[in-house]
């Protein structure tokens, strides 16, 4: 006989006997009157069988129908821990309703009239029992055949259970008191008579006793956390209080129990943080690698071993209950049970005690019951509480109302429910069937035989999982067939040939005898897992070796390149040494031919004004300076050498004549231009030697004079701009004091004067930002201020005579044209550059910039070339004849460009608040787009991050201020500072100078061309005349 039929018969019989035993013990005559209106309402669990329905409420305060009153003293209903609730005030007494009719056989069982005559002989009507069992067999005959064939290893004793059970069932009527737990199946719901609330609570306490829901709550290990457990805490049931409906109802659906996590649905195909292992296996039937499969298997074994070490085991070890997160880690979201050997001993002892002892000692709570596990298949729903011993699983609970053929309404309801079940979507049926099949694949032989399950059941499931992780299937149908054969320990030939070692290991795990299977710890120590570790170690070692080989090879290539470069540099140095010796020898021979100066050359090889070739012999005093800057000198030298071939290429030069387009030049300017052209050598080696000579020639700034022009009553004394007149006899200083002060140059030499007063002082309405002297008209000056006003002043009268107010924001810079003294240009924060004429009130033209204009400068070597610096980190050059597009754009600074100066006709120097100066070669620019290759050199050493510190150039020398209250000097061919000078603070009372920055900075510098002297001013209004020595 199939297992499902026998279990169903046992379920029915157990219900009947248990009900009778409990009803006979109810003290019906002593019910409390105040509880007569109390009704216990319950609903049966859902069944997969068509026709199942919920029981109707029965009012027990009224007598039963006449046909039942003879033998019935109390009507009963089905009571479970999940559907227990009390409804008061119910007056429903329609016992003859269709729903009540479904309980008719239960009423008969309760009053002993179901299978006995008036004398109470249970065997007097065996025909009714046979008919009931026959109907159950017919109903179960339509169940899937697979369910009846799940026991390839089931023992023969299962066939004998039904006969023994039938004998106990027939003998039940002969004993008024019998051991109900001996007949109760673990999947059967408890039947209890309805009585007063005190009696109901007593029954609930007894029902919960041993179920693990009233004991101490065991925490779930972190390896086995359910998705439902994240961020939630379950309430513990207090056993010191009487159970109430609120205490009992949550027990059935609680996601966490003592030793077990319960899920409402067996379908765990997806998770919010990954996919289930089943989905992964299904999606990679034919493309899985052995290494990856063994890696996942090792994680599974480690999880199982961790649970076993805590005396727990996994109740649902199957792929659907594992989640594979993106990090390729497995997470168990199923249930687990507690494996306690002491509980097994206690339960075996309690099972041998007579029922009389149990009845007399109802207050004893030490007895532990087995776990109540309802398995609805397919699409099962696990609802369980903890237990103190290994678990058993049984077939689904059969609703006894289904077999009540005497009630026609019951049949009608069965048909309706059957139709509803048929209307379930195909997707749901497919998922349910898939889950049901998976359960059958992973059910161990001892569970099918009805034996206890425990740690060894996990080992069997691991064997099935190992096969699934390694096998290759072309389709789902082939996979299902392989899994069906696996239950009989039949492995595919391809699997045996491809994985012989793994196949033997898999069969070891699938051994029919649990005692012959290894433990999880043995699996971790097995050759299969250790071999995987060795493979990983070998792979890691190979990877490290490959990485090391790649590193060494790359380093070798890099060093060979450096060696080649070094050899090339050495060859270059040898050639330049030979060239320098040749030049020096020729110069020495030339000098010696003049007998008048031969003695001088021998005594002093380096004169103060030495030639380029004589720079080979450096005075001892400058040796330390050269060696301290050897790295920068080296970079400058090799940069110069790299530019030799590029400078001789005509393709890199601009083809237009804008750089040297002069149609109005004075005689002096023509001479200066010719001298500049003659002085500029095309020999890069000679240029470098010249720079080295000049670097070695000067070592410091010497103070030649000081002008203290700061106002004692005005703290705002910053000098923003300095400018010499055409004859360089007077210097104009302007700043935020709103005054333009003109000093006599000779006043710098008079150190005896404490405070110097200007020759002329002109007052402006706003703070001044720039002043510029006209190079042709001696008395004319131009200034810009913070209001955006451009004004022309007459230094002879000390008055301004013309104002230009088209700028809308602060004007930063103004410059007169060297070729046309009546024209000047200004730049402003309104992003415009305006060209003016002294003879016109309105601007002659406007050039719009993408950002604020910080400085403007005319070229001294061209009539039409104009350059300005912008706050967008770029320098723009324009041909004034074509102002729609820039003549070139120079990009390379990292902050706003504060100053622009023409070094010569082909070179521009720019200053920025990024702590650097840059030298630009205009011959390497282009008219379309940026000119990244135009930057020849970058000078660093000074500090300039937020203030305008001044910039001035003369004959290859560059001077600028610093926010460290210093003046720095560079030479055009070398990137490092040649020398520097630090301003000191002057005590206004004593007049003594002390060195304390206190936030001061050098704000303006200006070269005096006649004497190679520099005038510098700082933020306190002090001006110094400095000379390179």
From Swiss-Prot:
Its EC number is 2.7.-.-. WD repeats lie at residues 714-753, 763-803, 806-846, 848-888, 892-930, 932-971, 997-1029. Induction: By PHYA under continuous far-red light. Circadian-regulation under constant light. Up-regulated by red, far-red and blue light, and during the night phase under short-day conditions. Residues 557-589 form a coiled coil. Changing residue 767 to E: Loss of function. It is found in: Nucleus speckle; Nucleus; Nucleus, PML body. The active site is at residue 316. One of its GO terms (cellular component) is nucleus. Residues 42-69, 213-269, 347-392, 653-679 are annotated as: Disordered. Changing residue 573 to R: No effect. Loss of function. Controls normal photoperiodic flowering and regulates circadian rhythms. Required for suppression of photomorphogenesis in dark-grown seedlings and for normal elongation growth of adult plants. Integral component of the COP1/SPA E3 ubiquitin-protein ligase complex. Involved in HY5, HFR1, LAF1 and CO degradation. Interacts with CO, COP1, HFR1, HY5 and PHYA. Light induces dissociation of the SPA1/COP1 complex. Binds to CRY1 in response to blue light, this interaction prevents SPA1/COP1 complex formation but stimulate CRY2/COP1 complex, and thus avoid COP1-dependent degradation of the transcription factor HY5 by the proteasome and promotes hypocotyl elongation. This is Protein SUPPRESSOR OF PHYA-105 1. It comes from Arabidopsis thaliana (Mouse-ear cress).
């Amino acid at each position: 006989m199939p297992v499902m039929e026998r279990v169903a018969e046992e379920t029915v019989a157990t219900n009947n006997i248990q009900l009778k035993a409990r009803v006979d013990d109810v003290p019906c005559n002593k019910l409390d009157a105040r509880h007569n209106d109390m009704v216990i309402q319950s609903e049966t669990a859902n069944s997969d069988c068509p026709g199942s329905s919920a029981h109707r409420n029965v009012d027990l305060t009224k007598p039963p129908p006449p046909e039942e009153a003879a033998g019935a003293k109390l009507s009963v209903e089905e009571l479970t821990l999940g559907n227990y609730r009390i409804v008061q005030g119910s007056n429903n007494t329609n016992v003859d309703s269709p729903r009540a009719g479904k309980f008719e056989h239960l009423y008969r069982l309760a009053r002993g009239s179901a299978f006995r005559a008036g004398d109470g002989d249970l065997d007097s009507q065996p025909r009714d029992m046979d008919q009931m069992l026959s109907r159950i067999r017919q109903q179960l005959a339509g169940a899937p055949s697979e369910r009846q064939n799940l026991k390839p290893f089931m023992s023969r004793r299962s066939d004998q259970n039904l006969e023994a059970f039938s004998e106990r069932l027939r003998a039940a009527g002969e004993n008024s008191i019998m051991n109900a737990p001996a007949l109760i199946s673990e999947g059967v719901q408890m039947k209890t008579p309805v009585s007063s609330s005190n009696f109901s609570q007593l029954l609930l306490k007894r029902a919960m006793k041993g179920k693990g829901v009233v004991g101490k709550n065991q925490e779930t290990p972190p390896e086995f956390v359910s998705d439902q457990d994240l961020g939630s805490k379950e309430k513990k049931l207090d056993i010191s209080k009487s159970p109430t409906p609120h205490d009992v109802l949550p027990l059935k659906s609680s996601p966490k129990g003592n030793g077990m996590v319960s899920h409402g649905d067996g379908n765990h195909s997806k998770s919010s943080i990954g996919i289930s292992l089943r989905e992964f296996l299904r999606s990679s039937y034919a493309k899985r690698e052995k290494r990856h499969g063994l890696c996942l298997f090792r994680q599974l074994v480690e999880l199982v071993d961790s649970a076993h070490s805590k005396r727990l085991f996994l109740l649902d070890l199957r792929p659907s209950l594992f989640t594979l997160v993106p990090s390729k880690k497995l997470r168990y979201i199923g249930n687990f049970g507690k494996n306690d050997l002491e509980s097994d001993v206690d339960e075996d002892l309690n099972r041998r005690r007579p029922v009389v002892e149990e009845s007399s000692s109802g207050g004893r709570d030490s007895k532990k019951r087995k776990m109540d596990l309802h398995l609805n298949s397919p699409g099962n729903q696990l609802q369980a509480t903890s237990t103190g011993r290994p678990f058993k699983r049984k077939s689904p609970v059969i609703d006894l109302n289904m077999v009540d053929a005497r009630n026609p309404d019951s049949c009608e309801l069965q048909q309706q429910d059957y139709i509803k079940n048929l209307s379930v979507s195909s997707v749901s049926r497919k998922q349910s069937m898939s889950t049901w099949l998976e359960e059958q694949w992973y059910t161990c032989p001892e569970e099918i035989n009805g034996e206890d399950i425990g740690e060894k059941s996990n080992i069997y499931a691991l064997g099935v999982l190992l096969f699934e992780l390694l096998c290759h299937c072309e389709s789902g149908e082939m996979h299902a067939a392989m899994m069906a054969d696996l239950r009989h320990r039949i492995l595919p030939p391809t699997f045996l040939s491809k994985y012989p070692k793994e196949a033997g290991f898999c069969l070891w795990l699938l051994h029919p005898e649990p005692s012959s299977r290894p433990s999880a710890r043995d699996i971790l120590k097995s050759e299969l897992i250790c071999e995987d570790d060795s493979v990983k170690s070998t792979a890691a070692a190979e990877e490290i070796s490959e990485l090391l080989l790649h590193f060494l090879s790359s380093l070798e290539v890099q060093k060979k390149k450096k060696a080649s470069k070094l050899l090339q540099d050495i060859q270059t140095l040898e050639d330049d040494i030979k060239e320098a010796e040749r030049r020096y020898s020729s110069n020495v021979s030339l000098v010696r031919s003049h007998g008048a100066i031969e003695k001088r050359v021998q005594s002093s090889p380096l004169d103060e004004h030495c030639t380029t070739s004589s720079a080979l012999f450096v005075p001892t005093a400058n040796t330390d300076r050269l060696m301290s800057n050897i790295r920068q000198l080296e970079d400058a030298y090799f940069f110069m050498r790299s530019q030799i071939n590029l400078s001789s290429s005509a393709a890199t030069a601009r083809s237009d004549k804008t750089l040297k387009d002069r149609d109005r030049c004075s005689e002096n300017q023509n001479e200066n231009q010719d001298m500049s052209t003659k002085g500029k050598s095309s020999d890069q080696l000679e240029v470098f030697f010249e720079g080295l000579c000049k670097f070695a020639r000067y070592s410091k700034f010497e103070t030649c004079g000081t002008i203290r022009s700061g106002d004692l009553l005005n703290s705002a004394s910053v000098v923003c701009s300095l400018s010499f007149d055409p004859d360089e006899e007077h210097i104009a200083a302007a700043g935020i004091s709103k005054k333009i002060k003109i000093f006599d140059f000779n006043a710098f030499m008079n150190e005896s004067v404490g405070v110097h007063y200007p020759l002329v002082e002109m007052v402006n309405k706003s703070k001044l930002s720039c002043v510029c002297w006209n190079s042709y008209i001696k008395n004319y000056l131009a200034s810009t201020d913070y209001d955006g006003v451009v004004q022309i002043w007459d230094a002879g009268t000390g008055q301004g005579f013309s104002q230009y107010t088209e700028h809308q924001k602060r004007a930063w810079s103004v410059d007169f044209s060297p070729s046309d003294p009546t024209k000047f240009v200004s730049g402003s924060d309104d992003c415009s550059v305006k060209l003016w004429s002294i003879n016109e009130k309105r601007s002659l033209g406007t050039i719009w910039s993408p950002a604020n204009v910080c400085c403007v400068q005319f070229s001294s070597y061209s009539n039409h070339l104009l350059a300005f610096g912008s706050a967008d980190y770029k320098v723009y050059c324009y041909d004034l004849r074509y102002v729609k597009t820039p003549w070139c754009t120079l990009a390379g600074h990292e902050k706003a460009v504060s100053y622009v100066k023409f070094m010569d006709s082909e070179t521009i120097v720019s200053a920025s608040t990024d702590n650097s100066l840059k030298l630009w070669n205009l011959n390497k620019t282009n008219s379309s787009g940026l000119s990244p290759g135009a930057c020849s050199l970058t000078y660093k050493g000074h500090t300039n991050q937020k203030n305008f510190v001044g910039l001035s150039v003369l004959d290859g020398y560059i001077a600028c201020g610093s926010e460290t209250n210093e003046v720095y000097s560079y030479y055009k061919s070398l990137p490092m500072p040649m020398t520097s000078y630090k301003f000191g603070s002057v005590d206004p009372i004593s007049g003594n100078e002390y060195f304390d920055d206190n936030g001061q900075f050098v704000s303006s510098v200006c070269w005096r061309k006649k004497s190679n002297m520099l005038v510098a001013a700082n933020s306190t209004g002090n001006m110094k005349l400095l000379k390179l020595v």
